[in-house]
Amino acid sequence: MDTLKQLIDYYQTNGSYVMEEFWRHFLMSAYGVIFAAIIAIPLGVYIARKKRLAGWVIQIANIIQTIPALAMLAVLMLIMGLGTNTVVLSLFLYSLLPILKNTYTGIRNVDGALLESGKAMGMTKWQVLRLIEMPLALSVIMAGIRNALVIAIGVAAIGTFVGAGGLGDIIVRGTNATNGTAIILAGAIPTAVMAILADVLLGWVERTLNPVKNKRKPLTEAL
């Protein structure tokens, strides 16, 4: 009960500070995922057509994913210095694999009969991609973005070690305090809530975009 009271008191006293770090934390995570999506989605579409290249590209993304977060930040800090840019770049790198792999999988799993139907109707490669492949793969791609954002929110917590702030800053303050359990929770709870909300919201978007649950428009309507 004492911890709960201290937690409530902390929020009442430092509410604006917690909200500021909450939004900073979210924006770092969101920017990292957005930049990764800008690169990974076109790259995933490209390697879906280049089977030999796909293995190498996905393997490189896998290797990046296995690098410990603190080690990644330490290396990037030597190159870019302290601050949010270092964290955003590390989140960008960690977000590449789920988005890239899901884009590749989504495009590869499109029914070949639909592709042939589109070509038979005189569609160009760009039209086939825009009107058939991307709509059918969109829910799978969104699942990758969803996973990437949840991962990014967790990893962003250690951004405090390179002076980027975020909710990790509150958690570290708690670990340095003599009786800092309430302060640790003050940073950990919003981090968990953010990850859960991101997962639920993007999960809903993913289900909405699922072509199996939506009536497919005839190709003639799409044209």
From Swiss-Prot:
Segments forming a coiled coil: none
Keyword Transport: yes
GO biological process, one term: transmembrane transport
One Gene Ontology CC term in the entry: plasma membrane
Membrane-spanning parts: 27-47, 63-83, 87-107, 148-168, 182-202
PROSITE patterns: ABC_TM1 (PS50928)
Record key words, sorted: Cell membrane, Membrane, Stress response, Transmembrane, Transmembrane helix, Transport
Localization, UniProt: Cell membrane
UniProt xrefs under InterPro entries: ABC_transp_perm/SBD, MetI-like, MetI-like_sf
Pfam families reported for this sequence: BPD_transp_1
Induction: The complex is induced by either hyperosmotic stress or by low temperature. Osmotic induction is sigma B-dependent.
S-S bridge residues: none
Gene3D superfamilies: MetI-like
The ABC transmembrane type-1 domain, residue ranges: 22-202
SUPFAM superfamilies: MetI-like
Membrane topology, as annotated: Multi-pass membrane protein
Entry-linked PANTHER family: GLYCINE BETAINE/L-PROLINE TRANSPORT SYSTEM PERMEASE PROTEIN PROW (PTHR30177), OSMOPROTECTANT IMPORT PERMEASE PROTEIN OSMW (PTHR30177:SF4)
Function: Part of the ABC transporter complex OpuCABCD involved in carnitine uptake. Probably responsible for the translocation of the substrate across the membrane. Involved, with BetL and GbuABC, in osmoprotection and cryoprotection of Listeria. Can also mediate weak glycine betaine transport.
Assembly description: The complex is composed of two ATP-binding proteins (OpuCA), two transmembrane proteins (OpuCB and OpuCD) and a solute-binding protein (OpuCC).
Family: Belongs to the binding-protein-dependent transport system permease family.
Name recorded for this polypeptide: Carnitine transport permease protein OpuCD
Organism expressing this protein natively: Listeria monocytogenes serotype 1/2a (strain 10403S)
